[in-house]
């Protein structure tokens, strides 16, 4: 019996961007934190914004044609890390968890950021996101000092060198 059909796409139509806004709202609602400090509403209104190529990227994960997950990266222009980007908005809808989509999305973002010429990827995550922190560690991310202000208690800041060896999800 074949598994689900998983595709990663880059939104390129008005309908795709509307689906992106919907899943990003699901992401924000799943956090139980206020993302106003990140300008979240402006981000949604201005999509693709900083996620536009060539410096950024937004991916949607489709499972049997349904939008199941998302993830993005954008240039990180103001940090202590040269030639870095930031992974943002990695999320898989609960009904689609356990397919390995988080890993597929994260690894695809890292690969595409490497292809875009970045040498490092940074991100922040929260204490209660234990599964996500384990995923990031397995992909080579390590804790670093804060690279921007996050007022949410328990924020962790992580960095991975791009182009470094990472175990492949596909074997």
Would you name each region that the model predicts?
Residues 106, 113-124:
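Conserved GNAT acetyl-CoA-binding A-motif
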